[in-house]
UniProtKB/Swiss-Prot annotation:
Originating gene: tolB
HAMAP family, per the entry: TolB
NCBIfam families reported for this sequence: propeller_TolB (TIGR02800)
Annotated source species: Rickettsia akari (strain Hartford)
Family: Belongs to the TolB family.
Protein name: Tol-Pal system protein TolB
Amino acid sequence: MRNIIYFILLLLFSFKGYALETINIEHGQAAPTPIAVNKFNIDSSADYVLGNDVVKVISNDLKLSGVFCPISSASFIEERTGIEYKPLFAAWRQINASLLVNGEIKKLESGKLKISFILWDTLLEKQLAGEILEVPENLWRRAAHKIADKIYEKITGDAGYFDTKIVYVSESTSLPKIKRIALMDYDGANNKYLTNGRSLVLTPRFARSADKIFYVSYATKRRALVYEKDLKTGKESVVGDFSGISFAPRFSPDGRKAVMSIAKNGSTHIYEIDLATKRLHKLTDGFGINTSPSYSPDGKKIVYNSDRNGVPQLYIMNSDGSDVQRISFGGGSYTAPSWSPRGDYIAFTKIIRGAEGKTFNIGIMKAYPQDDENRERIITSGYLVESPCWSPNGRVIMFAKGWPSGAKAPGKNKIFAIDLTGHNEREIITPEDASDPEWSGVLN
């Protein structure tokens, strides 16, 4: 983020002997770490209400992660705030706070906010992290997300994912149904609509830089256009008129190419497009439906689903279409694969048909499993769960979840997030029905 200037705060103490073990968020569910996010000290020139809002956003980020359990401020004993003093650690231990966040906010002559924080280990009485951020006042929420990112990274060892965006398809709950591309913060805040609802829109995707999105729009029932929209300028342009396309492209890690599925002559195949020349290269052959391609983080492989053997299964191939290998072998239909940014897992939707109808599942599998490993793990199920996508640190999956009419009357579609362990499932609040989420990388 150009407007944010970072000043790394010099650490006051050595980190040696850190009492809290680094939390491994991949293996099962551990008890959340109690953390106290103290009221930030606000100077006379800064907005007191805004200061409280910063604390609320930090606390909410940490709570939503499932890694931390923020302690209610009503139980705080020490009344001092700010970063100019050493805390009374015994007072924080008395309320079982293993971690403490102190901070302050000042308004500079330039009009920017100077937001500082320190993360303390109350058991060893050591400072763990600290930073100062200078931000335009309207970007205070992003500053709060970045502070939460720093805390999360220090305790888990994984990069944070709070300063990110979600693009998705919003659908009105009243008739006539109107679908629009919408953009929001990862936690549902700052929702805004990017299209006017005059045409059917599908599958928004972020470009690698996260300052552009691509989506499919049906100007007519038979004509599908892929649009590119610049999120900074609002300008929009047509990337291509691809008859038979059903999903927006997914982009290579270097941002130079994209893959998509296009239906022609009774078959649907995977194509790669060079974004500079707009030239298409067909990657799959034979009969059948091949859809939902997704690049590996290094761009060398592509995962997709194909019904070439009768039932949709997952396959991996080299990015040039060679060396095709099937990777799913369970019962049911596998669709919508999404490769983790870490490269270790592939998320997917699995549909199992039984006597009582279909059951939808979101699962993960090792991208390169060993022979003795379980190939997949289901992490959530429901009437309709689909369209999984990954947080930029590869530790959280966001997906669309639907209910039939009567269960959450009338039928609804909403966006949920869940840890890759299958724990901490939570709804991301949106103004209207929501589907087809796509998670950006961490913002600059």
